[in-house]
Amino acid sequence: MKSLAEYLELSAKTHGHLCAGQVLGVRLAMLGLRELGIDDPVAERKRLITYVEIDRCVTDAVGVVANCRLGKRALKFRDWGKVAATFVDLKTGRAVRVAAKESSKQAAREMFPELDKEAGQQKAYAQLPDEILFDKQWVKVEVPPEDLPGFKGPRVVCAQCGEGINFKREVVKNGRTLCRSCAGEAYYKPAD
């Protein structure tokens, strides 16, 4: 595994800047990988799926350290608004969820009271012990075959809009195969 400094440099380059969320995300992912015994996530990239629970700076850092990407189907996003990630070892079936403790912010303030919030958190998050920053929990994650990297499933066509649907994401409603948008789950509306 790379050093904290190396991962912070890579993460800042990918994300566009270094911030407290990047430091926390790098530390969170390093802990998750250590717990699973994955030392080289690049060499073992097909062994890991990571579920992230927030769409903030932390997630970019987790993706860099764990070498997981949405486009490789190894990074899964659950919009729960939590600074947490679950690391699933596909080889062993083991999974660990690592979540930032809310008390870590106060620990950072106490460690560096002379610094502004952002600078204090960056510095403290790089130095505080894992047990002060994070809760970890061994969990069980059932990953359906269609969510695995490399899955090659059937492609179907929506009976209403005619768009293709991959990875068993279709909905059957009143006997018709529909995409989620046409089935009423759209996140957008036509701009008339």
Residues of each region from the PLM?
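Short, hydrophobic/aliphatic alpha-helical segments
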Residues: 1-14, 161
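Conserved phosphate/anionic-ligand binding catalytic regions in large, soluble enzymes, centered on
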Residues: 14-32
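A structural-propensity feature for long, helix-poor, extended segments
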Residues: 47-87
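Short Cys/His-rich Zn2+-coordinating modules
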Residues: 134-146, 160-165
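Short, flexible, mixed-charge glycine/proline-rich loop motifs
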Residues: 143-155, 168-173
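Short cysteine-rich clusters marking metal-coordination/redox-active sites
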Residues: 158-162, 179-182
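Short, non-ligating residues that shape and space the ligands of small metal-coordination modules
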Residues: 167-168, 188-189
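Cysteine-rich micro-motifs
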Residues: 173-185
